[in-house]
Amino acid sequence: MSQRIEGLFLRATKIKHNSIIVDLLTRQYGRSTFVFTISTKKNQAFLFQPFHFIEFSAAYTPEKKVNRANNVEMKFPIIDILSDIRKTGYALLLTEILNKVFHTEEKNEKLFVELEKMIISFEHRPFNAVF
């Protein structure tokens, strides 16, 4: 049964001209891997960037290492982080660190909510090296 899942982008690997494997930190399941079929007409590849929170539909099966997903949407826009090169650098660094830190598929909703708050705060505040 398909359900809506929220996730924070960690890493992506393009496998075909229209498919991409994405590692996400999800609110419901912890770190998970999904395959998305992306449409070049809709420019969906833009959604898979550091600090992007996305929401999508998937029939999640814990036994599978990779699940298929579709109907991807950005949860909230991240504009200032992408337009400020200093913030973009921090986003790339922190996304890489998060990718290395989260190995297990354990659900940790508190951590997900705190990361979400931190990223929203980073988006809306002026750049400060010690945010």
Give residue ranges: language-model regions:
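Non-catalytic alpha-helical scaffolds and adjoining flexible linkers that form interface surfaces
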Residues: 1-131
